Every structure is written in structure tokens, then in C-alpha cells.
A protein has these predicted regions:
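Primarily membrane-embedded glycan-assembly and transfer machineries that use lipid-linked glycans
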Residues: 1-181, 206-324, 337-339, 385-389, ...
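Transmembrane helices and adjacent periplasmic/lumenal helix-loop junctions
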Residues: 186-203, 315-326
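Active/binding-pocket-proximal capping segment
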Residues: 328-333
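Aromatic-enriched
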Residues: 335-339, 343-445, 451, 455-462
Length: 462
């Protein structure tokens, strides 16, 4: 077990100060310099303002040009429940609301970094510079690395809802589901934004019928709340706006990292695009389900969440790169679990290809497809420019990410992995006095160990 001194070394304090400075300077840049800083948060806030016509804002919630900024005409794309959740911001000054979003984003990044730190510690791996930074300093430095990666950088810029979605999903899986069944927080996340419902696949693989029922009931409750409190807007969303893909944006934009997005970036369209998407989507669900089962046998909850997050952005028709806020957790899972436990059983050539794809995905998505596409000074939207280097190359990291996870899933089919000894989760060795350390650490032990042993007993008696 790797241990660090309780006192934070000077370099760790410098890392903490650097993180605080980055957050403060980032906030000032967004409100004072960047004309589009907090753009998405402004849309959330205006959506909430329509409920009581705050500040004289009287537009319909699902009007096509809900917010107009220059040539941009942006709609409100979320369920009515999301507008209700953001209602408190309608009564706060815009700058105060942005400050809360920035602090919330930084807090979510810190928590994710804490989980990744605990993940590495439980795996017996030390993070770079951990010895000279100390525990808190290492988490601060890791938070900086997380917030500078493509998805989080763009999320910070737009003040997006994705860190909240991530926090709800992660919390539901790493908390002790003793009094409140698992699935409640995922259902709430689905009420804010539909795509998190795909995390129900983990519950399905676990045969957690209570969790699935709880998820479904919670999600339906969010819909009911929308119909009760917003009786005019709810039918507009559920019977009209939800089926209009043009409201989300241009599906061919280089920042679309979904399967459908990178297929278009590589030149497919029309029937070939549809057939390719449906085939790869079906393959993805099947292989990820197999991988989730093998991860379940080993109690690898964090890897399950990371893999399913990748499936979520792959299946959605449009997934902007900033939707992929679980990317840091997936990269950690690849390093700590995928390659040392699973990929090692692949043939040498396949293992090298998977490693190369993982590097391309990690580096490319850390930079972000938008930046890569912009470097070439070429058009990033029009269909006629599909084979322009900026679009094709910008789309390759998202393909590489998907392909890496598929390699991982195929590796989980190998006989040595399938026949490996089932062992309980090892997060219990993480220090219990860590900030929020029981989330993703000690609280998982008894529940997850019991689940693993139960599954092992079923297999032995089958």
C-alpha cells in the first residue's frame, strides 16, 4: 500500500494555490473577456426565467430561437424538469449564477480527481510527483490536469450541466445503497438530460431489478413533475421537440464524437451512414454488456461507469466532446485495469494496436476535436468538406476511443480472463479519512464483496 505524509509539502501547497488561481482567473476571463463565456448556463437560466417571466423574459421555453446572440439562434434542448431545477438561478444575478457554476464545476473536478487518486492507490500505483506533492497536493495537481483536458476545458467555458450529471451518476454507483435504492440519482440525471439513462445497463448486467425499477420510477416522476408544474411546455417537449434533431445542432460538426459523428467525418452519408451506425451501435451494446459483466465479477465499479460513459457518448446521435467529462476516469481505467488485466491476453499485434489507439484517443480528445479541426483552417461544418483533413483527423480520436473500448471488450472474452479467480473489490484499503473518501472507496467493500460472492455462488451451483 502506498502511503504519503499527512502534512502537505511545499510543492503540494503550490499546486493547491495554482488550482485556486486557475479557477479565479478562469472565472474572470469568462465574465470579463470572453463574449460567449457561460453561454450554456445563460440558456439554462433563461429557461428557468420563462416559468415566472423573470426580468421580462417571456419567450416560449421550446421556441426554435430561444436565445439569439448575433447570428446564433439557440434553443432550450432539455426536458421541463431541467428548467425547474435551474429555477433558483432565475432569481440570482447572472454573474452570481456563473460564479456558482464555476465553483460547482471545480468541485466536481476535485471530486473526480479524488476518486481517480483513490482508484490508483487501491491498485497499488503511485501517481507522478505524488511523493513531493503529498496527497492533497497530488489531487490538486490532478484536478488541474482534469480541468485542462478538452471536455472539461469546454465545459468550464460554457458552464455546462455535464459535471452535475457526472456527479449524480457516479454518486449513485459509489454510495452505499442501504436506505435509498440505487437508481434514484441516475433517474434524476435522466430527467435533466436523457442520455444518462444508458447507465441502467450496469444495473441490468448486475440483475439489480430493484435498482432498475427505482431508476425507471424516478425518471417517470421527473416527467410527471414537468407535466404538473409546466403543463404547456411538457407536451411540447415530449411530443415534438424531443424528436427534432436540428434543435441540438449540426450533426456533421467536427466536435460530434458519437459513432454517427465520426462516420460522417470519414465520408459516410445516406443509407450507408444509417446501416453503419445501426450495426456499430448494436455491436457496441453487445460487447460493452459483456465487458460490464466481466468487470462486475471483479467488483470494478469505476471501470464500469467509465466504460458506460463512453457508450453513452457513442450511441447518442450528437455528442459534443464536452459531454465526455468521464474521459479522465476512462483513461485511468485503461491504465489501471484494461491493459494490465485484460489487454495482456490479446495477441501481441492486437495489444500494440489497442495501445496506439488509446494514445491517439487520449491525446486527441485531451486537445479536443474542435482545436484539431481548427488547426487546418478548413471548414468544420459542411458536408462537402467531409474529407477535409481538419474534419477527418479531428474525428479520428473519437473513433480511437470507441475502438479501444471495443478491444477491451474483446479481450474480456478470452479464456484466461473469463476463468480468472473472482476477487472482491480492493477499494477498502484507501484511507477512510480522505475527503469524500468513502465515495468510491471503503463504503463499496461490504456491499460489492457480497455481490461478487453471490454471483460466484450462482456460477458454482449452475
Amino acid at each position: 500500500m502506498i502511503r504519503t505524509e499527512s502534512a502537505t509539502p511545499i510543492w503540494g501547497k503550490i499546486a493547491i494555490a495554482a488550482l485556486i488561481l486557475m479557477v479565479v482567473c478562469g472565472y474572470l476571463f469568462e465574465i470579463l473577456i470572453n463574449p460567449f463565456g457561460g453561454l450554456d448556463f445563460s440558456i439554462y437560466r433563461m429557461g428557468a426565467m420563462t416559468i415566472f417571466d423573470n426580468e421580462g423574459f417571456t419567450k416560449d421555453l421550446y421556441a426554435p430561437a430561444f436565445v439569439e446572440i448575433g447570428v446564433l439562434k439557440l434553443p432550450f434542448t432539455y426536458p421541463p424538469f431541467a428548467a425547474l431545477v435551474f429555477l433558483p438561478f432565475a432569481f440570482l444575478p447572472l454573474e452570481v449564477g456563473k460564479a456558482i457554476m464555476v465553483l460547482g464545476t471545480a468541485a466536481a473536478a476535485w471530486w473526480l480527481s479524488t476518486i481517480i487518486y483513490n482508484y490508483a492507490q487501491a491498485s497499488g500505483r503511485a501517481l507522478p510527483l505524488q511523493g513531493c506533492l503529498g496527497r492533497t497536493g497530488t489531487i490538486a495537481a490532478l484536478t488541474i490536469v482534469v480541468m485542462l483536458c478538452g471536455p472539461w476545458r469546454r465545459t468550464f467555458d460554457l458552464m455546462q450541466i455535464n459535471p452535475l450529471i457526472m456527479a449524480l451518476v457516479l454518486a449513485d454507483f459509489v454510495r452505499p445503497a442501504t436506505r435509498v435504492p440505487r437508481g434514484v440519482l441516475i433517474g434524476i440525471a435522466g430527467g435533466l438530460k436523457l442520455t444518462p439513462l444508458v447507465f441502467g445497463l450496469i444495473l441490468l448486467v448486475r440483475r439489480d431489478w430493484k435498482g432498475i425499477a427505482t431508476l425507471g420510477a424516478t425518471f417517470l416522476t421527473t416527467i410527471a413533475v414537468g407535466f404538473i408544474l409546466l403543463p404547456n411546455e411538457a407536451p411540447q417537449f415530449w411530443f415534438s421537440a424531443i424528436s427534432d434533431p436540428s434543435r441540438v445542432g449540426d450533426i456533421n460538426f467536427v466536435d460530434n464524437i458519437s459513432i454517427q459523428g465520426w462516420l460522417m467525418h470519414f465520408g459516410l452519408n445516406g443509407t450507408a451512414l444509417k446501416l453503419g451506425f445501426y450495426a456499430l451501435a448494436a455491436l457496441s451494446v453487445a460487447l460493452v454488456a459483456v465487458l460490464l459483466y466481466q468487470l462486475e465479477r471483479r467488483g470494478k465499479t469505476l471501470a464500469q461507469v467509465a466504460v458506460t460513459g463512453t457508450l453513452m457518448v457513442a450511441l447518442s446521435p450528437i455528442s459534443w466532446s464536452h459531454h465526455n467529462v468521464l474521459l479522465p476516469l476512462l483513461l485511468a481505467a485503461l491504465i489501471l485495469d484494461a491493459f494490465p488485466t485484460f489487454m495482456v491476453h490479446l495477441p501481441s499485434a492486437a495489444r500494440k494496436i489497442a495501445c496506439l489507439l488509446a494514445w491517439v484517443a487520449g491525446v486527441g480528445l485531451y486537445i479536443s476535436p474542435r482545436i484539431i479541426g481548427g488547426i487546418t483552417q478548413l471548414d468544420m461544418n459542411g458536408l462537402e468538406f467531409l474529407w477535409a483533413p481538419g474534419v477527418a483527423i479531428g474525428g479520428f480520436p473519437s473513433f480511437a476511443l470507441w475502438a479501444t473500448v471495443m478491444f477491451w471488450a474483446v479481450a474480456s472474452l478470452s479464456a484466461p480472463v473469463r476463468g480468472a479467480k473472482v476477487e472482491p473489490v480492493q477499494y477498502g484499503s484507501v484511507r477512510s479519512d480522505a475527503p469524500l473518501g468513502w465515495w468510491g472507496a471503503r463504503a463499496l467493500v461490504t456491499e460489492r464483496t457480497e455481490s461478487v460472492h453471490t454471483d460466484a455462488s450462482r456460477e458454482a451451483t449452475a
